[in-house]
Amino acid sequence: MKEVLMRIYSSKEENLEDYINKLFEGGIRGAVVLQGIAGFGKGREFHSEEIEVLSYELPVVIEVVEDREKLLNFLKENRETFKNCYITFERVKVWE
């Protein structure tokens, strides 16, 4: 099995629960949600919890370790759900 680490970058305001439910329903082994304290994305808008802003769209990263082909198939089937996310893959070795 060729496991990879998939990271899904999004903002807190986007529907995080939908993402997690899709991963769960898709048979993905597990997912971890990490919330950033500051960041910016493609729109070049800075988000931080230390600066008073009208919107607290703080960055969120969902990490998943799973078989590469399974993740690619999952993303093809759920393209519409994750269309506004930035997604990366990294090779990993899973300790057993």
Swiss-Prot record:
Alphabetical list of InterPro entries matching this protein: N-reg_PII-like_a/b (IPR011322), N-reg_PII/ATP_PRibTrfase_C (IPR015867), UPF0166 (IPR003793)
SUPFAM superfamilies: GlnB-like (SSF54913)
Source taxon at top rank: Bacteria
A matching Pfam family: DUF190
Database matches in PANTHER family: UPF0166 PROTEIN TM_0021
Family (UniProt): Belongs to the UPF0166 family.
Name assigned to this protein: UPF0166 protein aq_448
Organism per entry: Aquifex aeolicus (strain VF5)
